[in-house]
Regions:
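A compositional/structural signature for long, glycine/proline-rich flexible linkers
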Residues: 1-400
Length: 400
């Protein structure tokens, strides 16, 4: 992604505006893939390796590499062998891997610098890597004027209007990786649906009544997922703190589905902590037609080694969240926001509302949608006090 997300972005729910994304799906069934990330210095970055089921199984990140990442060789579950001494081996639990990179961008003037870093981030097959190394040794890299074609995955687009399409795509995906015993047991429980990994799902095998019952079950499941927001974690001061298994869900299938709906591709808490707020200090739902203030007392800013940000979202009827269009094109406020006004005691008050506030409050205004809204506070490389619950975010206060 060459530009930061804005209100038009609808590809992934709950996007952030702090980083530029780099996204790729890796097919490891036939051969390994090499990942080379350039020296990032002190800039925040993370490349999360997620399994087919969105479990984070490995990171290339500042927290672990100190800004000087080593090359990685990512291999599938059936691959035999080892890597060269100068390459770190990453073993994936599934042949399909979602690699999602995040690189901190400090406003529009910083975009070109991040574009260069993205351009130096390489994904290569063994043959591509060997060819590049030969060309580099021969100093011919600069003469290569025709870049290799981008690989294209032969995957059909999911038809959201057809509930059976999920079975079709899902069984194809499951057929490309060996299943663990836990997932095999789940599929056995679903035997009446005739779901077989790698086999085409045939809805014609069911009667009209059976197809109707399946559609009803899918609709009920979606309602259950949307209604499971309290499953996200403990709620303190109106803020929902993530469960410890965020990003590595195990057999917590409802939590996995909830995160896929409202926070797809979430990192583990040690890499980034996501705190969600949907209610004010009196447990009333947040609505942009009201006026709110979030006040951080002096010395009580969110503790994060990398950075923190507070993002405003418009909530769709199905529970997803996206940026809201606003006259100042501001979607988040954080520790890098220029021009914030602090109190004489060092406190910070952020004003949350749809209507334009008084001029004296404009510097700290985070525009809200005209209806239901959601706040997400992100802390990248969070401090232990945030992870263990010693530090708590203050409640959002409604101004009547």
């Amino acid at each position: 992604m060459l530009f930061r997300s804005d209100h038009r972005a609808r590809a992934v729910t709950t996007p952030n505006t702090d980083t530029l994304y780099s996204s790729a799906w890796l097919d490891l069934a036939a051969e390994p893939i090499f990942l080379t990330v350039p020296d990032m210095g002190q800039r925040y970055y993370s490349f999360a390796c997620m399994s087919l089921f969105t479990d984070n199984f490995a990171y290339v990140c500042r927290r672990l590499d100190g800004g000087k990442p080593r090359p990685r060789m990512i291999v599938g579950p059936s691959w035999k062998g080892d890597s060269d001494a100068d390459v770190e081996l990453i073993r994936a639990p599934t042949n399909s891997v979602w690699l999602l990179g995040r690189i901190l961008v400090d406003g529009p003037p910083d975009l070109e610098t991040v574009w260069v870093l993205q351009g130096k981030t390489l994904l290569e097959t063994p043959d591509m890597r060997n060819e590049r190394r030969i060309l580099e040794m021969q100093e011919l890299m600069r003469q290569r004027t025709v870049p290799p074609p981008d690989p294209v995955a032969d995957w059909p687009a999911l038809n959201r209007d057809d509930p059976f399409d999920l079975f079709e795509v899902g069984m194809r995906a499951l057929g490309e990786s060996p299943l663990g015993e836990r997932d095999k047991a789940v599929l056995e429980d679903l035997a009446p649906l005739r779901l077989r990994p790698g086999r085409k799902f045939d809805q014609r095998a069911f009667s009209d009544a059976e197809r109707g019952a399946i559609k009803t079950g899918i609709a009920r499941a979606r309602d259950e997922i949307r209604g499971a927001s309290r499953q996200w974690g403990a709620i303190v001061n109106g803020w929902t703190y993530p469960k410890n298994n965020l990003g590595n869900f195990g057999d917590d299938y409802l939590y996995r589905a909830l995160v896929a709906l409202s926070g797809l591709a979430a990192l583990e808490p040690a890499e980034a902590t996501y705190l969600t707020c949907n209610t004010d200090q009196d447990h009333r739902g947040l609505d942009g037609k009201q006026r709110y203030v979030l006040r951080f007392p002096p010395g009580q800013m969110p503790p994060a080694k990398a950075f923190w940000s507070l993002t405003m979202y418009d909530v769709t009827p199905d529970g997803r969240a996206f940026f809201t269009d606003n006259p100042i094109s501001r979607y988040a406020i954080g520790d890098r926001t220029k021009g914030l006004q602090y109190g004489a005691d060092g406190s910070l008050e952020i004003h949350l509302q749809h209507e334009r506030p008084a001029e004296a409050l404009m510097a700290n205004w985070l525009p809200a949608p005209a209806g239901p809204m959601r706040l997400v506070l992100r802390a990248y490389e969070p401090a232990p006090s945030l992870l263990d619950g010693t530090y708590r975010i203050p409640a959002v206060r409604r101004i009547d």
